[in-house]
Amino acid sequence: MRILQICSARQIGGGERHLADLANGLTRRGHDVFAALIPSSPLPPELSSVPKQNIVQVPMRSVLNVSSALKLARFASENRIQIIHAHVARDYPLAALVARRSSAHLILTRHVLFPMNRAHKLTLRRTDRIIAVSQAVADELRSQRIFSEDQIVLIHNGIDVDRFARGREDRFTNNKDADQNLRVGMIGHLAPIKGQEDFIRAAAIVCRRRRDVEFVIAGEDKSRSGEHRRRIETLIAELNLEQRLSLIGWVDDVAKLLSKFDLFDSPSRSEPFGLSIVEAMAAGVPVIATASEGAREIIDDRQTGRLVPIGDVEALAEAISGLLADCELRERLSAEAQRRVRERFSLERMLDATEEAYREVLQ
């Protein structure tokens, strides 16, 4: 199949990592994959399997950018594109116009729970399929009544499990070397919805109980003002955690970072899927997550991880303390979590399901 992936993202997050894995995986399977990106896109280095000549860079501010739409339509026609697949909501109307002018089929992936706007309702009726990355996202799409039941398909995000998996020996010990603390980490862009402040307050409680624990927050504040990072830094100082909690910014190699964690926490207030949760589980790191929409689909409490109520700092601190004190439980949760990821959230399963969605619309 000849497939054009469209993405105007300016930064890399979970959705962009998903796109890169999808494009590279489909290319390795023998499909002709193309990518339309904005000139400042950070994605080209991530598309390691996609031929460089298959990547086109065009401004994609909105569907009103007619010149870009016409350029992409010509590109799609000249390259005999069969499937146009868009991943960012602001790109959906543009992708719909390009698909219509080039006679290609239109596939969308929905990564978030936010309602679509009026432009989407007016332009997306002829979408062939919209992929929801979780049951929660699929339910939200149904509630908006833009797409029919036949148009909505559930395909969970998948990851390259082997890239994250590693040996678990020597990690699950109650007592490390004197100079080696236990490490609890979280990964996600700095924003109130991601729950960093709850994580910090829980860290303060745990630090009062144990001296051998340190905490790590990886991620950047994507806002122009940087206000949330400043709030986080202020809270860390107020709780006297400067020596116990590190803000390390954006990390390119997530698998390497996860290999340094003894526990992973996802304290989000809302999470449509939870790619970082799946990555941590694949890496064999026991996970504690708030019972957000996506986390409830991924984790069975006390079987493949721990779930705690959203916003309950005391419960989060208790879960962290409990797992740090019980190495046997950490090891059991880790093994079950890795098994769960291989069964349900592997890259191969995602590629199989996406290929099937493509084939269905081409029939």
Describe these PLM feature segments.
Residues A315, G322, L329-R344, A353-E356:
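A short, well-ordered alpha-helix in the C-terminal region of glycosyltransferases
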Residues W250, R269:
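Aromatic "clamp/platform" in nucleotide-sugar-dependent glycosyltransferases that forms part
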Residues G13-D21, M186-R208, F215, R306, ...:
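A conserved mid-protein helix/loop that constitutes part of the nucleotide-sugar donor-binding site
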Residues V63-S67, D139-S143, D150-Q151, G158-N175, ...:
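Acidic anion/phosphate-binding donor-loop and adjacent secondary structure
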Residues R100-Q135, D139, R145-F147:
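A conserved, positively charged/aromatic
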Residues Q5-L70, F75, Q151-L154, S223, ...:
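N-terminal strand-loop element at the rim of the active site
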Residues D301-R302, R306-V313, G322-E328:
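Conserved acidic donor-binding segment of nucleotide-sugar-dependent glycosyltransferases
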Residues A36-L37, P286-A289, I299:
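Short hydrophobic beta-strand element within catalytic cores of glycosyltransferases
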